[in-house]
């Protein structure tokens, strides 16, 4: 990988907080499990998003349609070699200090996170792009096997790059998310949302860049009712090319989550640092360390968690 062009990374990772508190009944246990599933999906999606960092080559890449889940953007100089189709995959092994994301510490565990999917971002006209994305995520826990689950995302939308404002990108997209048990024969959660957002890249040199962004996820429909939320998030990402093959990433996200059918209100933070060793433009080895904090007006759903792990990633563009 070379540094012939500046590159910018925005980390779209957010840690969603989860669902309203209730007495300790079987139904409440279901709420707790669903809450943690949704939060883990977005937390690990944000962390592993740093893994999709191989240099895509010359050409402008708008905010990737996979970005809402994978957390990457590439911004280079436009030319005719822009590749609109991306295939991506990641397999990572993590240790988490609080697997169930419970108040008071919780139990640690190892888990495997697997992600694979495809994104198509065709240029429609000028600086207007379309996008269609499919993403499958699988989470498998070593000891707490009852926490294992699958996540499927399907969505699409439009992206517009305002060159006159320093390549400020604005976008709108629809997303459908479905969580199931590991055998995919029972639904845990689903939600349909519209995401509106913008992001502004800053290039300091060929080796250093940053991005600021804002996302608003607006609920259209979802189930179970207690798990449905809107989300408003501020994001900041930084990338440094340490060598020709080694890159460092930092990101921070602050999210406000008002739940639709309950009085629950959460403030969520995630801070993550990662390293990527790019073996080739298509394949990389990654490691990360992250801390997440959730502050809720329902004390039961306040928690903190530390995650560390490593994995391998592939990103192919056509």
Q: Where are the language model's segments positioned?
A:
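N-terminal periplasmic/intermembrane-space "pro-region" immediately following the signal or transit peptide
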Residues: 2-3, 24-86
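Outer-membrane beta-barrel "beta-signal"
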Residues: 277-278, 284, 288, 304-318
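Outer-membrane beta-barrel architecture
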Residues: 74-75, 115-119, 155-159, 195-199, ...
